[in-house]
Protein backbone atom coordinates (compact mmCIF):
# COMPACT_ATOMS: atom_id res chain seq x y z
CA UNK A 1 0.00 0.00 0.00
CA UNK A 2 1.36 3.43 -0.97
CA UNK A 3 1.75 5.73 2.04
CA UNK A 4 3.72 8.57 0.43
CA UNK A 5 3.70 10.11 -3.04
CA UNK A 6 6.97 11.93 -3.70
CA UNK A 7 7.11 14.46 -6.54
CA UNK A 8 10.65 15.39 -7.53
CA UNK A 9 11.73 18.88 -8.51
CA UNK A 10 13.80 21.90 -7.51
CA UNK A 11 12.74 24.43 -4.86
CA UNK A 12 12.42 28.12 -5.65
CA UNK A 13 10.34 30.38 -7.86
CA UNK A 14 12.88 30.32 -10.70
CA UNK A 15 12.32 26.56 -11.18
CA UNK A 16 8.55 26.51 -10.66
CA UNK A 17 7.44 25.96 -14.26
CA UNK A 18 10.47 24.05 -15.55
CA UNK A 19 10.51 20.60 -17.11
CA UNK A 20 12.48 19.23 -14.15
CA UNK A 21 9.62 20.25 -11.82
CA UNK A 22 6.86 18.19 -13.40
CA UNK A 23 6.92 15.97 -10.28
CA UNK A 24 6.19 18.99 -8.07
CA UNK A 25 3.39 20.10 -10.40
CA UNK A 26 1.71 16.69 -10.19
CA UNK A 27 2.16 16.48 -6.40
CA UNK A 28 0.36 19.82 -6.03
CA UNK A 29 -2.56 18.65 -8.18
CA UNK A 30 -2.95 15.38 -6.25
CA UNK A 31 -2.79 17.26 -2.92
CA UNK A 32 -5.49 19.62 -4.16
CA UNK A 33 -7.72 16.77 -5.35
CA UNK A 34 -7.39 15.02 -1.98
CA UNK A 35 -7.78 18.28 -0.01
CA UNK A 36 -4.54 17.82 1.94
CA UNK A 37 -2.93 20.24 4.42
CA UNK A 38 0.58 21.52 3.70
CA UNK A 39 3.43 21.84 6.18
CA UNK A 40 7.22 22.00 6.07
CA UNK A 41 9.09 19.23 7.86
CA UNK A 42 12.64 20.39 8.54
CA UNK A 43 14.25 17.02 9.25
CA UNK A 44 12.84 15.55 6.05
CA UNK A 45 13.91 18.68 4.12
CA UNK A 46 10.52 18.61 2.45
CA UNK A 47 7.21 20.32 1.96
CA UNK A 48 4.71 17.67 2.96
CA UNK A 49 0.98 17.60 2.42
CA UNK A 50 -0.75 15.52 5.08
CA UNK A 51 -3.86 13.83 3.70
CA UNK A 52 -5.44 12.63 6.93
CA UNK A 53 -8.59 11.25 5.32
CA UNK A 54 -6.43 9.05 3.09
CA UNK A 55 -3.54 8.14 5.45
CA UNK A 56 -1.17 9.58 2.88
CA UNK A 57 1.75 11.99 2.65
CA UNK A 58 2.45 13.96 -0.51
CA UNK A 59 6.05 15.09 -0.48
CA UNK A 60 8.07 17.71 -2.36
CA UNK A 61 11.75 17.39 -1.33
CA UNK A 62 13.44 20.78 -0.96
CA UNK A 63 16.99 19.46 -1.36
CA UNK A 64 17.23 20.13 -5.11
CA UNK A 65 16.79 17.33 -7.59
CA UNK A 66 20.26 15.79 -7.44
CA UNK A 67 20.07 15.40 -3.64
CA UNK A 68 16.53 14.01 -3.45
CA UNK A 69 17.83 10.89 -1.71
CA UNK A 70 18.67 12.83 1.46
CA UNK A 71 15.05 13.92 1.88
CA UNK A 72 13.60 10.53 0.90
CA UNK A 73 15.88 8.62 3.28
CA UNK A 74 14.90 10.92 6.17
CA UNK A 75 11.23 10.59 5.23
CA UNK A 76 11.43 6.78 5.29
CA UNK A 77 13.19 6.84 8.67
CA UNK A 78 10.95 9.46 10.31
CA UNK A 79 7.68 7.93 9.12
CA UNK A 80 8.81 4.29 9.34
CA UNK A 81 8.10 3.67 5.66
CA UNK A 82 9.42 0.89 3.44
CA UNK A 83 10.63 1.60 -0.11
CA UNK A 84 7.65 -0.23 -1.62
CA UNK A 85 5.30 2.15 0.27
CA UNK A 86 6.45 5.22 -1.66
CA UNK A 87 5.56 6.29 -5.19
CA UNK A 88 8.08 8.66 -6.81
CA UNK A 89 6.95 10.91 -9.68
CA UNK A 90 9.55 12.56 -11.91
CA UNK A 91 10.46 13.84 -15.37
CA UNK A 92 12.08 11.55 -17.94
CA UNK A 93 14.15 12.82 -20.88
CA UNK A 94 13.98 9.49 -22.69
CA UNK A 95 10.20 9.58 -23.03
CA UNK A 96 8.49 12.06 -25.34
CA UNK A 97 6.19 14.67 -23.85
CA UNK A 98 2.81 13.00 -23.44
CA UNK A 99 4.16 9.61 -22.36
CA UNK A 100 3.59 8.32 -18.82
CA UNK A 101 5.09 5.09 -17.45
CA UNK A 102 4.28 3.41 -14.13
CA UNK A 103 6.96 0.98 -12.94
CA UNK A 104 7.28 -1.20 -9.83
CA UNK A 105 11.07 -0.76 -9.68
CA UNK A 106 14.08 -0.18 -11.89
CA UNK A 107 17.36 1.58 -12.45
CA UNK A 108 17.81 5.34 -12.45
CA UNK A 109 18.00 5.46 -16.24
CA UNK A 110 20.54 8.26 -15.79
CA UNK A 111 18.15 10.47 -13.78
CA UNK A 112 20.25 11.99 -11.01
CA UNK A 113 17.35 12.51 -8.61
CA UNK A 114 16.40 8.84 -8.85
CA UNK A 115 20.07 7.82 -8.60
CA UNK A 116 20.35 9.86 -5.40
CA UNK A 117 17.33 8.05 -3.94
CA UNK A 118 18.68 4.62 -4.95
CA UNK A 119 22.07 5.38 -3.36
CA UNK A 120 20.53 6.83 -0.19
CA UNK A 121 17.99 4.08 0.53
CA UNK A 122 20.20 1.30 -0.90
CA UNK A 123 17.60 -0.17 -3.26
CA UNK A 124 15.95 0.47 -6.60
CA UNK A 125 12.87 -1.50 -5.54
CA UNK A 126 10.39 1.33 -5.15
CA UNK A 127 7.48 2.22 -7.45
CA UNK A 128 7.74 5.23 -9.70
CA UNK A 129 5.95 7.16 -12.41
CA UNK A 130 8.08 8.53 -15.21
CA UNK A 131 6.62 11.53 -17.03
CA UNK A 132 8.08 12.18 -20.46
CA UNK A 133 9.49 15.63 -21.18
CA UNK A 134 11.33 14.72 -24.40
CA UNK A 135 14.91 15.47 -25.37
CA UNK A 136 16.36 18.86 -26.28
CA UNK A 137 17.07 19.83 -29.84
CA UNK A 138 20.66 19.12 -30.92
CA UNK A 139 22.12 22.50 -29.98
CA UNK A 140 20.61 22.77 -26.51
CA UNK A 141 22.42 21.31 -23.50
CA UNK A 142 20.45 18.85 -21.35
CA UNK A 143 20.86 20.91 -18.18
CA UNK A 144 19.53 24.03 -19.92
CA UNK A 145 16.64 22.03 -21.34
CA UNK A 146 15.44 20.45 -18.08
CA UNK A 147 15.70 23.81 -16.30
CA UNK A 148 13.72 25.61 -19.00
CA UNK A 149 9.96 26.20 -18.92
CA UNK A 150 7.65 24.32 -21.23
CA UNK A 151 6.98 26.10 -24.52
CA UNK A 152 3.62 27.75 -25.02
CA UNK A 153 2.56 25.13 -27.59
CA UNK A 154 3.45 22.31 -25.15
CA UNK A 155 1.31 23.59 -22.27
CA UNK A 156 -2.01 22.17 -23.52
CA UNK A 157 -0.47 18.70 -23.73
CA UNK A 158 1.32 19.24 -20.39
CA UNK A 159 -2.00 20.02 -18.68
CA UNK A 160 -3.45 16.75 -20.04
CA UNK A 161 -0.37 14.83 -18.88
CA UNK A 162 -0.57 16.32 -15.38
CA UNK A 163 -4.28 15.51 -15.15
CA UNK A 164 -3.74 11.95 -16.44
CA UNK A 165 -0.83 11.34 -14.06
CA UNK A 166 -2.81 12.66 -11.08
CA UNK A 167 -5.67 10.27 -11.96
CA UNK A 168 -3.11 7.48 -12.34
CA UNK A 169 -1.84 8.18 -8.81
CA UNK A 170 -5.39 8.16 -7.41
CA UNK A 171 -5.94 4.83 -9.17
CA UNK A 172 -2.74 3.39 -7.67
CA UNK A 173 -3.85 4.53 -4.21
CA UNK A 174 -7.24 2.89 -4.62
CA UNK A 175 -6.44 -0.29 -6.58
CA UNK A 176 -2.69 -0.83 -6.30
CA UNK A 177 0.06 -0.82 -8.91
CA UNK A 178 -0.72 -4.07 -10.72
CA UNK A 179 -4.31 -3.05 -11.45
CA UNK A 180 -3.22 0.45 -12.51
CA UNK A 181 -0.54 -0.39 -15.09
CA UNK A 182 -2.87 -0.42 -18.10
CA UNK A 183 -4.57 2.82 -17.12
CA UNK A 184 -1.34 4.65 -16.35
CA UNK A 185 0.99 3.56 -19.14
CA UNK A 186 -0.24 5.76 -21.95
CA UNK A 187 0.75 8.18 -24.63
CA UNK A 188 -1.42 11.27 -24.15
CA UNK A 189 -2.28 13.29 -27.27
From Swiss-Prot:
GO MF annotations, alphabetized: peptidyl-tRNA hydrolase activity; tRNA binding
Active site: 20
Keywords, comma-separated and alphabetical: Cytoplasm, Hydrolase, RNA-binding, tRNA-binding
EC number, as in UniProt: 3.1.1.29
GO biological process: protein quality control for misfolded or incompletely synthesized proteins; rescue of stalled ribosome
Binding site for tRNA: 15, 64, 66
Keyword Hydrolase: yes
Record-annotated site: Stabilizes the basic form of H active site to accept a proton: 91
UniProt keyword annotation of Cytoplasm present: yes
Compartment annotation: Cytoplasm
CDD domains named in the record: PTH
Origin superkingdom: Bacteria
InterPro entries: Pept_tRNA_hydro (IPR001328), Pept_tRNA_hydro_CS (IPR018171), Pept_tRNA_hydro_sf (IPR036416)
Catalytic reaction annotation: an N-acyl-L-alpha-aminoacyl-tRNA + H2O = an N-acyl-L-amino acid + a tRNA + H(+)
GO CC terms, sorted: cytoplasm
Pfam family, one: Pept_tRNA_hydro
Main EC class the enzyme belongs to: hydrolase
Site (Discriminates between blocked and unblocked aminoacyl-tRNA): 10
Subunit-level organization: Monomer.
PANTHER family reported for this sequence: PEPTIDYL-TRNA HYDROLASE (PTHR17224:SF1)
Protein family per UniProt: Belongs to the PTH family.
Biological function: Hydrolyzes ribosome-free peptidyl-tRNAs (with 1 or more amino acids incorporated), which drop off the ribosome during protein synthesis, or as a result of ribosome stalling.
Protein name as catalogued: Peptidyl-tRNA hydrolase
Source organism per UniProt: Persephonella marina (strain DSM 14350 / EX-H1)
Name of encoding gene: pth
Amino acid sequence: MIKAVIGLGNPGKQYEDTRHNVGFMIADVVASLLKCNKKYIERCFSHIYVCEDHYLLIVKPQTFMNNSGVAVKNLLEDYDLKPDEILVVYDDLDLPLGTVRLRKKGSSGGHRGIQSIIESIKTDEFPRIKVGIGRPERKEQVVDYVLSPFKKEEKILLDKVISHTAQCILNVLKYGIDKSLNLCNKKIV
